Amino acid sequence: MTKEKELHCSFCGKEQKEVDKLIAGTSGYICNECIELCHDMLANADDIEEIDEEFQEEEPKLPTPHEIRAHLDDYVIGQDYAKKVLAVAVYNHYKRLRSEKNTSEVELGKSNILLIGPTGSGKTLLAQTLARMLNVPFAMADATTLTEAGYVGEDVENVLQKLLQNCDYDIEKAQQGIIYIDEIDKITRKSENPSITRDVSGEGVQQALLKLVEGTVASIPPQGGRKHPQQEMLRVDTSKILFICGGAFAGLDKIIEKRTNTGGKGIGFGADVRIDEEKVSLTELFKQVEPDDLMKFGLIPEFIGRLPVIAPLSELDEEALVKILTEPKNALTKQYQVLFSLENIELEFTQEALIAMAKKALARKTGARGLRSIVETLLLDTMYDLPSIENLQKVIVEEETVTENKAPVLKFNS
């Protein structure tokens, strides 16, 4: 006699008599206990998805101005006033972007930044360090290479193309980015009065940059192609991009001195006589800059209005240049010491050598920018021979290496 086959749950294997209900399907059965278990699992899955969505929507914490300033201190020596101005402006810019996601009756204005300071004072480094800290795309352009659309040269919209390239053409990321335009003082118009003739590399470029800096929806060809009528364009909202413009503005100090009467010039008994020590520093003068001064220099009023935050940088003295060589996280001397350590060789710079290098950079009037070429020249022959020299333990750069072009001192393993 064959035993009648008992019905059982296809999932847990329990027989019909062990459960309250057994529901039949086309090719199997499921019990009430398994149904309840599946229900709980689905409910938990919904909760997990909601948590995931909330987690994804939560933005990373925006660093405070104090935190931004502290990070800049790690990489840039001096320029305390400029760092403070930048920290506040950058914090307010990204706070503004986040506030746009919430409905607000008050529209917050865009605060682009103008950096004014001598060559090699750290303008580019400040902008690069900010972008790296905030983990946002960064693009840099030289204003002297830009021209209006239709002229030979680099179209101003190419700057946006570079920004998109640096974030793999992710438009949302690009719109959180920073664009630094260097040598902005080189595109000033030749006189205060508007010219009848076209000024291709001056006022015309300012006009072309105006819309981008102010905020517009620019059409950019994908993957760096050329524009043509049938092409589908990428649309980038530049009102969300932070623009930082920088320049040396040589001669602007004279314009400010003339307006504020701080130059100490004059003849006769009523003249304002000053000794050199009392002369107002370049940084203090630039802190007093007004839109009218920039107009006299050659920037158009509309362009000045789009750069409301002005951060002046000071000239670097000998002490600052020595610190730049040794103190920042990526200081030049540290970089070359790492290079030499890859060959298991120690590299040392004497204090006198560091001072001599700083003096040489000051004499060349290249600021911090000229330090790398000085160090590279000093170590060129040594680096050329380095892989071929056996038992070399240490290389010492002394003052004579800098001032008299003597070879660095080599020490060998005994």
UniProtKB/Swiss-Prot annotation:
SMART domains: AAA, ClpB_D2-small, zf-C4_ClpX. ATP binds at residues 118-125. CDD domains: RecA-like_ClpX. GO terms for biological process: cell division; proteolysis involved in protein catabolic process. GO terms for molecular function: ATP binding; ATP hydrolysis activity; ATP-dependent protein folding chaperone; protein dimerization activity; unfolded protein binding; zinc ion binding. Keywords: ATP-binding, Chaperone, Metal-binding, Nucleotide-binding, Zinc. Residues 1-50 form the ClpX-type ZB domain. GO terms for cellular component: HslUV protease complex. Zn(2+) binds at residues 9, 12, 31, 34. Component of the ClpX-ClpP complex. Forms a hexameric ring that, in the presence of ATP, binds to fourteen ClpP subunits assembled into a disk-like structure with a central cavity, resembling the structure of eukaryotic proteasomes. PANTHER family: ATP-DEPENDENT CLP PROTEASE ATP-BINDING SUBUNIT CLPX-LIKE, MITOCHONDRIAL, ATP-DEPENDENT CLP PROTEASE ATP-BINDING SUBUNIT CLPX-LIKE, MITOCHONDRIAL-RELATED. ATP-dependent specificity component of the Clp protease. It directs the protease to specific substrates. Can perform chaperone functions in the absence of ClpP. Belongs to the ClpX chaperone family. This is ATP-dependent Clp protease ATP-binding subunit ClpX. It comes from Histophilus somni (strain 129Pt). The gene is clpX.
